[in-house]
């Protein structure tokens, strides 16, 4: 269950700056960029969280950040670097 601060209601998806996804930009990368934008927006509201809500938000923030780093590491195309 998401805790929503009535002072800052969620207004819907965050628009992502930059080019629209194409065949050369896999959908997974586009979703990762969207999550990064969402985390950057959520970071603005972190000071308003108190006590256990803040602790949970910080744990979630770090867990998502770790997941994004892993996703970027393991979502690389397989490239044969051997010549000849």
Curated annotation (Swiss-Prot):
A Pfam short name = Tecti-min-caps
What is the top-level taxon of the source organism? Viruses
Please give a single GO biological process term from the UniProt record.
viral capsid assembly
Alphabetical UniProt keywords: Capsid protein, Virion
Q: Name one GO cellular component term.
A: viral capsid
Q: Which cysteines are joined by disulfide bonds?
A: none
Q: Where in the cell is it found?
A: Virion
Quaternary context: Dimer.
What does the UniProt record say this protein does? Minor capsid protein essential for stable capsid assembly of complete particles.
The name on file for this protein is: Minor capsid protein P30
Organism of derivation: Enterobacteria phage PRD1
| Organism lineage | Viruses, Varidnaviria, Bamfordvirae, Preplasmiviricota, Tectiliviricetes
